From Swiss-Prot:
Belongs to the Mediator complex subunit 15 family. Keywords: Activator, Nucleus, Transcription, Transcription regulation. Residues 122-140, 174-189, 279-291, 333-343, 584-598 have a biased composition (Low complexity). This is Mediator of RNA polymerase II transcription subunit 15. Residues 101-140, 161-228, 249-311, 323-363, 575-602 are annotated as: Disordered.
Length: 785
């Protein structure tokens, strides 16, 4: 191919340039959770790992998206952490090959995670349970946490290759890759683990007694994902997260030792997913073989790769991990006992006494440490069923956002969709946040029709979204998080309320008159739906940072997506001032802790200071608003908007007559987004799509004084579609960067000409190459980024 095509240095250099700003943002927004290495190291790692352009492009897209998610959700790594512990060891085969060859990964230290077995169906569920990330382990430290946070967003990579990867010698780890922290026991045959005898006394057992960090202290380098309840401080979850209880899995003292698929495993012969997986997972029969210091096993992953390989370890988990979140599958719950049982289940039912040398840790965090109890799993399942009705709306909105070029918003919606459809398992706390967010963004999601017809959908008619944020219809203070257990200190501290509490809560919510439930107040516009005072700050300042360039005001929670404004325009006739400052809602209502209900949801806007109500008024921003708006588009439109802006995020941005007429003349060939975004005080972004070619939209930055002033092309920093059409985008932007183009017509004509020329050239090759031969829907549906 040409020198600009993969794998040419020029092509790779372009990818590196695209990665650098994302890594920079990651380092800035999440300094405590850095993605190790610079852009070149990351790209080289991916390049060494991938054998085809298709595989390479998909992997880069995953990395970029993961980095972006990590940067935006560094404060919530617990929600995403689990996945980091589940990367299939041999995913090197990614899309290109159906099998992961250890030799292929040889250049990069193998990922110590034994998740290949875990990737198997039954194990997957168990692994996901292990991956449960509860806020209890706030000490997310080290790059691993970052990878976890990053990987979580991309972990669920249900594409066909993931299955192959998992089936592949995922457990195989190159010899010598044993985690340093892992005891030899971890490398012992998996079979012994089911009995608990497999782990040597010295090995970190699922109890986490051996070698586990002091209670409450995260395993070395692992940060403290609360994955395990067993090990030190309940770090056993790590082990679980690491992967199938298989070799060194949660059962094995060092899941990574096994995960690394030491020579020992390799010597055992071809990877036997079931043998490997079930041998160690037999203990799961009673409970997930959590290694009290499952975290430790993970630590090997870090420790082992903290060195130059540290980067690969994080990236490995980021790229390879199948999304394994806290088990929402009941299968995950150890039938033999409560996963959350204190002592971290020193001994699995099948392993009385636990692994030798792994004393039961009475101090282990008993609840929500990383594995959900059966009761919590029931709540999780019930919530999924209740929210299942939102899937179509989320899917529609995601598609709409993507069509409008707002890929970050679309991605976030797709992640939520994958959770609701059960393709991705998350912690109960994350699900609670998602439930409340969906309830509050009812209007944005166009879920109104379901509000009255689907009483089972707890979130849709939640008073939170209807403006009755302060109290329930019966006068009881409403818990913004959607269930009694999701309040105040309980948030992330105690287990979610039992199912019957949830049912009661739902009943209370349904008691509200239909009129109130369907009230036209747009939660999005009303300060994001009301203060989420009940819980701890879920995302720290970062959430605010992303949502508002003007830190003193957080009006227009969602001005960026044009679809939102479009959807909200019809709401402008609704009662009450809708475009008030986000904090006006917070200021007008008392937090759940105050017990003082407030009915002033539709009253006069109150411009509360961001720190009002003890600083908790910002919580809704941090907790929810950063789910959808992306920091790139969401911030720009708010720059010029004042507190009195209308609900759509401020006055509509209109082009002047000259620009509008010029675009109207081109409407036969181009579809122009009617709702323009403001790029800055003097420029407006116009998004155009070709009617005859399914290519990413072109974003033109038009001066408000057009035709005076220069039109430029805006290329978002994170444009996953640009990776799907990377070659095309490179050609297009190179062409549009040449001198000679000045008017909107010039740019659109040049764009169309270049795209048609590119398509014709590719037709001779049988169409676009594999990396771009699939549509966006296929890409996102399968990658679930």
């Amino acid at each position: 191919m040409s020198e600009e095509d993969w794998p040419s240095p020029k092509f790779r250099e372009h990818v590196i340039q695209r990665l650098e700003p994302e890594l920079a943002r990651n380092r800035q927004n999440a300094p405590n959770l850095p993605v190790p290495g610079d852009a070149r190291q990351v790209e080289e790692y991916v390049f060494a790992k991938c054998m085809s352009k298709d595989e390479y492009m998909r992997t880069i897209a995953k990395v970029i998206n993961a980095i972006n998610c990590n940067s935006k959700s560094a404060a919530v790594p617990s929600v995403l952490q689990p996945s980091q512990f589940h990367s299939p060891p041999c995913t090197t085969a990614v899309l290109g090959t159906g099998v992961g060859t250890p030799g292929y990964r040889a250049p990069v230290p193998p990922d110590p995670q034994p998740t290949s077995a875990q990737a198997r169906n039954p194990p997957v569920t168990t692994a996901t349970t292990q991956a449960s990330t509860t806020p209890s382990a706030p000490a997310v430290t080290g790059t691993v946490s970052a990878s976890a946070a990053v990987a979580a967003a991309v972990a669920s990579f249900p594409s066909p290759d993931s299955a192959a990867l998992r089936a592949a010698p995922g457990g195989q780890t190159t010899p010598g890759s044993q985690p340093s922290s892992g005891a030899p026991g971890s490398t012992t045959p998996n079979a012994p683990f089911p009995n608990g005898a497999g782990a040597q006394p010295g090995a970190p057992t699922m109890n986490g007694g051996a070698g586990g960090p002091p209670m409450g202290q995260p395993p070395p380098q692992m940060g403290a994902p609360n994955m395990g309840m067993n090990g030190p401080g309940g770090y056993g979850g790590y082990g679980m997260m690491n992967g199938p209880p298989g070799a060194g899995g949660p059962m094995g003292g060092n899941p990574y030792g096994q995960p690394m698929k030491k020579e020992m495993d390799q010597s055992r012969g071809p990877w036997d997913p079931q043998g490997h997986m079930y041998q160690q997972q037999q203990p799961w029969g009673g409970m997930p073989p959590q290694q009290g210091h499952g975290g430790y096993p993970n630590r090997p992953m870090n420790g082992q790769q903290t060195t130059p390989t540290g980067t690969s370890s994080v990236l490995e988990s980021l790229i390879n991990q199948p999304q394994q979140y806290p088990g929402h599958h009941n299968q995950m719950a150890p039938p033999g006992g409560d996963r959350n049982a204190a002592g971290g289940r020193a001994g699995v039912p099948g392993n009385p006494g636990g692994v030798p040398g792994a004393p039961q840790r009475p101090g282990a965090m008993p609840v929500n440490q990383g594995v959900m109890s059966i009761e919590d799993q029931n709540v999780y399942q019930m919530k999924l069923r209740n929210m299942r009705g939102s899937c179509d709306s989320l899917r529609t909105r995601a598609r709409q956002c993507r069509q409008e070029g707002n890929h970050e918003a679309a991605h976030k919606l797709e992640v939520m969709l994958s959770v609701l459809e059960g393709r991705r398992v998350v912690s109960l706390e994350y699900l609670n946040h998602l439930e409340t967010w969906i309830a509050r963004k009812q209007d944005f999601l166009n879920i109104n029709p379901m509000g009255g017809g689907n009483p089972g959908h707890m979130g849709m008619n939640d008073p939170v979204m209807n403006g009755d944020h302060g109290m329930m219809s019966n006068g009881q203070v409403h818990n913004p998080y959607g269930h009694p257990g999701y309040n105040h200190g309980q948030y992330g501290m105690g287990g979610p309320p039992p199912p019957h509490h949830m049912q009661m809560h739902q009943q209370q919510m349904w008691q509200q008159p239909q009129q109130q439930r369907m009230m036209p107040t747009d939660p999005m516009m009303m300060g994001g739906g009301g203060p989420m005072h009940g819980g701890p700050m879920y995302r720290g300042d970062m959430g605010h940072e992303m949502n508002s360039p003007v830190n003193s005001h957080r009006h227009n929670p969602y001005p960026s997506p044009a679809a939102m404004r479009n959807n909200m325009r019809g709401m402008q006739n609704g009662p009450g001032p809708i475009g008030r400052d986000r904090n006006s809602m917070s200021g007008s209502m008392s937090g759940p802790s105050s017990g003082a209900p407030s009915l002033n949801t539709m009253g006069t806007p109150k411009m509360g200071a961001p720190g009002s109500i003890g600083g908790l008024s910002n919580l809704d921003d941090f907790t929810y608003d950063d789910f959808l708006p992306n920091p790139i588009d969401a911030l720009q439109p708010t720059l010029h908007i004042g507190p009195g802006s209308s609900m759509g995020g401020g006055p509509r941005v209109n082009l002047n007559d000259a620009a509008r007429k010029e675009l109207q003349a081109m409407e036969g060939r181009f579809e122009i987004e009617p709702n323009h975004q403001r790029h800055d005080a003097n420029h407006i972004i116009v998004s155009a799509k070709m009617r005859n070619q399914p290519v990413p939209p072109l974003r033109l930055v038009v001066p408000i004084t057009y035709p005076s002033g220069n039109v430029t092309v805006d290329r978002t920093a994170i444009d996953l579609d640009a990776y799907l059409y990377d070659d095309l985008q490179n050609v297009v932007h190179e062409r549009l960067s040449r001198p000679g183009l000045s008017s909107l017509t010039d740019y659109l004509n040049a764009w169309e000409e270049q795209v048609n020329q590119y398509m014709q050239q590719n037709q001779t090759n049988g169409g676009m190459d594999a990396a771009f031969g699939v549509g966006n829907d296929f890409f996102y549906d399968n990658l679930n980024l």
